[in-house]
């Protein structure tokens, strides 16, 4: 998916009279990739923590430092350490920290990686800033704390259970992937995720 324009909120602007050629050369795009998931070993490889798992896999494949948040060049990877309903608080704190550190000319782009019930397992979709949280409490929290138009999303399909009962759905999203599903995640789904992330990064830089 080609992204032609970045939302205005993601671009740090400055009066034209204040911008010279040296300023333009110093402008940097800083990307923060935030993987959603619940904390603790009980939720490792659970459907609702697929975003966190995917970002962790990406860090390993790209030889990122083992400390979190993990930074390599202008890309920072973050794993959620809070429960899903409070995901936005951590993202807001990270945002505040980066805003204090970077130049006013730099643009900070946020990408939230999360599981998505509305997509079948194996589907990966880039969503532009804005739009509904689609009932995802982690996305709802991020929108509340950072703003609805402030971040891209990469949705990772986990499919729906047959039942629409709230308790059944909760049990389903907290259940763990089986071995066949994990093979799919580690191959096809991870490959799709990397391709979408690469396309997004290229679009941000142009």
From Swiss-Prot:
Site description Stabilizes the basic form of H active site to accept a proton, residues in chain: 115
Enzyme class: hydrolase
Stored Gene3D superfamilies: Peptidyl-tRNA hydrolase
An example molecular function term from Gene Ontology annotations: tRNA binding
Keyword Nucleus assigned: no
Compartment annotation: Mitochondrion
Record flagged with keyword RNA-binding: yes
The enzyme's E.C. designation: 3.1.1.29
Entry GO CC: mitochondrial matrix
Stated family: Belongs to the PTH family.
Protein name (database record): Probable peptidyl-tRNA hydrolase
Species, as recorded: Schizosaccharomyces pombe (strain 972 / ATCC 24843) (Fission yeast)
